[in-house]
């Protein structure tokens, strides 16, 4: 009997200590509703540094995202992003996205015709300073052993 109780307590302890993934948490509908619509990234900045060469979302230099357009549809968590800066490669892609209860923006960049469940890689960014006309996405990166934030400033289009 004692062994059974000990085994049950140990099992309960192991199950209760399991961490949750950023992509498996519940959705924050309030933040998502504020994000729906068409947006433009008005600036990309680096907290504590003037300029760092960063490849954002595995696509292009972070400065190429300045002026990019993002269409976010909240009712089905789909959308589209387009890089439009003249001195950078042009790129357009469907995306899936949502905001979890921790206030994190979860993003997957898809290839044309590709389903989100087939894409294994994605990005988790913090949401900050959200209003009806602007918000920030903050990506924490490691540069030379130090954590640095890349801040994408979105403005309603």
Predicted regions and their residues:
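Positively charged n-region of N-terminal signal peptides that target proteins for export
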Residues: 1-4, 18-19
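Sec-dependent N-terminal signal peptides
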Residues: 4-13
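Lipid interaction determinants
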Residues: 17-93, 101-157
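Single-stranded nucleic-acid nicking/binding segments centered on His-rich, glycine/basic loops
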Residues: 97
């Amino acid at each position: 009997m004692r062994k059974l109780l000990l085994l049950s307590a140990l099992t309960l302890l192991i199950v209760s200590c399991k961490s949750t993934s950023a992509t498996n948490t519940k959705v924050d509908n309030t933040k998502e509703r504020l994000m729906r619509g068409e947006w433009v990234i008005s600036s990309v900045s680096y907290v504590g540094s003037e300029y760092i060469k960063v490849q954002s979302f595995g696509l292009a230099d972070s400065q190429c995202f300045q002026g990019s357009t993002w269409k976010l549809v909240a009712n089905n968590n789909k959308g589209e992003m387009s890089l439009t800066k003249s001195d950078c490669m042009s790129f357009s892609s469907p995306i899936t996205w949502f905001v979890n209860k921790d206030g994190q923006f979860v993003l997957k960049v898809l290839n044309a015709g590709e389903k989100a469940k087939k894409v294994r890689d994605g990005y988790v960014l913090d949401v900050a300073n959200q209003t009806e006309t602007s918000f920030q996405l903050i990506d924490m990166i490691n540069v030379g052993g130090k954590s640095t934030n890349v801040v994408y400033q979105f403005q309603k289009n």
